[in-house]
Design a protein with these regions (language model features):
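C-terminal amphipathic alpha-helix
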Residues: 39-47, 103-151
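Bacterial signal peptide processing site
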Residues: 25-28, 146
């Protein structure tokens, strides 16, 4: 049996939580949009790099944004960053850095097997799931944050 005032306390706590929820969501979105706006130079650099290597160069910034993303974008960021991280891991395993690529081409010293692995990991960045996730992130940035990303 519950104490007599327990239901009133639970109702009051739930009511307060529901009143604060829109503000918390708004604060999260506002912080995310502020971070997006502050990182405009990074997005411009990524847009100017057709090879996609800029995504790796600015991975920590992308992870910071993903961590700040509103709840309704978490899945998109997870999918997008998962592909970027997998590509970075493949490069690391091959012993190359993003800066080792010239005009989007891998270093000549790589074996055929390493080139194939890198090409496969890079192609994952253009997979339907990753493109859909990036499109969702960009659309939200454009509509809500008024920011153009160019992912």
């Amino acid at each position: 049996m519950r104490p007599p005032g327990a239901r009133r306390v639970a109702t009051a706590v739930l009511g307060t939580a529901l009143l604060l929820l829109p503000q918390a969501c708004g604060d999260q979105e506002k912080g995310y949009c502020s971070a997006m706006s502050a990182d405009q130079k990074v997005f411009a650099e990524m847009q100017d790099d057709p090879s996609g290597v800029g995504l790796l160069t600015h991975r920590s910034t992308l992870h910071d944004l993903g961590d700040r993303a509103p709840d309704d974008l978490r899945d998109e960021w997870q999918t997008f960053l998962g592909a970027v991280d997998a590509f970075a891991k493949t490069l690391d395993q091959a012993g190359v850095q993003p800066g080792d690529f010239v005009d989007g081409r891998p270093p000549a010293a790589l074996s055929a097997a390493e080139r194939t692995r890198i090409a496969h990991a890079a192609s994952e960045l253009a997979s339907a799931d990753v493109v859909e996730a990036a499109d969702g992130i960009e659309q939200q940035a454009k509509d809500v944050c008024k920011v153009q990303l160019g992912l």
